[in-house]
Amino acid sequence: MKIIFNLLILFSLVNFINSQSTTQATTLKLEGTIYDQYPYYDNNFEPIAGSLTTRLVQNAINTTTRTPTLNTLLPFTTTNVMGRMVTPSLFQYFYQPNKNAPLTNNSGANFPIPMTVNLTLNPSTGTYVYDNQFFFPIDYQGFDTNPFYRNYTDGTDYHNFHFCLKINTRFTYTGNEVFYFVGDDDVWVFINDQLVIDLGGLHEAAGKNIDLTTLGLTKNKDYTFDFFYCERHTTKSTIRIETSIQAYCPFYDYCGVCYGDGSTCCDPVVNCNDGDLCTIDSCPPRDTIIPAGFSISDLCQHAPVSCPSIDMCTNNTCDSKSGQCTPTSIKCDDKSSQCLTLKPCDPSSGCLYTSSCTSAHNPCNTGACSNGQCQTKSNSTCAAELGNDPCKVYYCDINSGCVSQPLCKQGPDSCEQNVCNAGVCTIKKLDPSVCSCGCVLNKCQKNNCVTASNGTSVCSPLPLDEIDDGNPCTDDHCDETTGLITHNITTKCTGCMKCNTTTGSCSPTNNECQDGNECTDNICVAAATNINQGECSNKTVSCPTTDKCLVYTCDTNKGCVSKPVVCPNSGNCQVGVCDSVKGCTLVPRVCNSTAFCLVSQCDEAIGCITFEKRCSPDNSKCQSGVCVNATATEPGKCKSVDYDPKPFICQTGAIVSTAVVASVVVVGAVVLGAAIFAGKKGYDHWKANQGQVFASSNANPLYQQSNNGGENALFEAPQ
């Protein structure tokens, strides 16, 4: 009775506030994917017996695949031989899907299956435990749904002995976590992307303990926790995990698998086949949200088969009947409406043409074409070309090009001179002394009298005015018998070099090189051995390169065309951006959070992920961290809340004493009444009927039998 009286006094002094309490979880789920393996498809499984082998994998995890990477792919290194990596190249399929590989020898085919490992709280230590010395989680699953594959036993009973388990999670470091493991075969654990447990190879059960306080982690910061386990050999399979790490899954794929890639519920061959041999069918990206009313098949991706370019004269496209890239000759455009005639295709330049509107075809051609007709030089064009003298008449001769004749032609009377003044013809009568000197003229001459030294008028014939056409690029000729005047184009300029009607020299004429291809320069240049001989270069044009954010290509019809540079990302967390001077650079991907209690981070394997913020409590063994979102007046915050009921490790010793009682918080007078009047049975009845499960308290210290022989008055109910 004295003990009960003391308890009454102590309980009356306790002020217990239950509104800020929470219940400690009794289970911890580690969610991942297990990959069923079969030795015929991967001879790294069921090789000859091996031993524990460290340094098989690199110290840093592959952050893109979130899987380990072998230190070497050479099969005959000491570590690979000891670790029984018979075919190291197949290690990539230990923890990554290869479901559609052919079912042939060493193809690496595997079968992914979602897997959850449930750890149970040990309230006396505050750790979560999974202990299974008979660990065969996928018997009759994966490949083994087919009896053909059930041919491995432990001597008597069938089991699926060949599988690899991958668990990718995160946790918020609280400051005192531990992780213990015992099992076989390969086991690798990465924390903060660094290897902390290295138990590779085929071996008997082996263990390793990790105290996270030795890893240099920062309290209240999120870290990655990645666990990899393989069973590669008969006849045992054991595993024991004990940890206080509160691991959680920050991302689920559309199959509902933690850190999944969609492979457990989407098979591109089954779910995404569109029947088109010229598309590459793939499952939706792992972070795809499947809207209500839609199926996975509705969101599959179908990328066109890309066929490599051969040359400018060949189209290499996918044949819809065979699914193979098939080269065919390109069909060049009909450009007759542009007065262009097709030439043989050039592999480096593509379709080439010759213009029928060059001066070689007709010296009166301007080089322009309208509706399939070459445009010729007009009289005004020739006038401008030859000097535009108002006292001359200009026109274009199909044999000679631009020519001119006097506006005011001389008549038969040599004493009547037809004079032109600013385009106006007038007849001027000459004195017979200067115009009648007995000239005997041929058909190409005109009368001209000059005064001899003796003062007499003598004949000095001149060429007819119309013989000179004013074009220095023609050779003018008159037949003295018939008077026929001709103007022949000079032959000193050859090729694309044409005579300049102003200077009479040979000048390059680019129009003569027009090939109908906007990707060639169509430039006339002088030959190395003869400056009067022009040669067309027709070199491929160089498109601008000044703006590094534009990529130029040449279209044979349009010329240089540009499109924005698409800068590639580096992984999922480095975004490619373009600077017009520097070109492509990388910047970190920004993941925006919409609330204080939602964390948005970039995960290299996935991209932006959003998950609930985990708060680190002041005392992780006895408290839970609770996140409180911001309000209009208060910022978001984390707070620590006591577990209710208190875990046993947060209570005092089992024997009742004043010090013990003073440190134990009991939930109100109801508990006290139950304890006093009903003893242990009354307390148990109260505990079993509470709204919040008393899951984490296996014992009441007030009701523990004394280990030193002393009597605990509350251990038994009054008789």
From Swiss-Prot:
Residues 680-719 are cytoplasmic. The keyword Glycoprotein applies. Residues 119-261 form the PA14 domain. The chain crosses the membrane at residues 659-679. Keywords: Glycoprotein, Membrane, Signal, Transmembrane, Transmembrane helix. Residues 20-658 are extracellular. Its main location: membrane. Glycans are attached at residues 62, 105, 118, 151, 315, 379, 454, 488, 500, 538, 592, 629. One of its GO terms (cellular component) is membrane. It is a single-pass type I membrane protein. Pfam families: PA14 (PF07691). It is found in: Membrane. InterPro entries: Fibro_Slime, PA14/GLEYA, PA14_dom, Prespore-cell_inducing_factor. Residues 1-19 form the signal peptide. Belongs to the prespore-cell-inducing factor family. PANTHER family: PROTEIN PSIB-RELATED-RELATED, PROTEIN PSIH-RELATED. This is Protein psiI. It comes from Dictyostelium discoideum (Social amoeba).
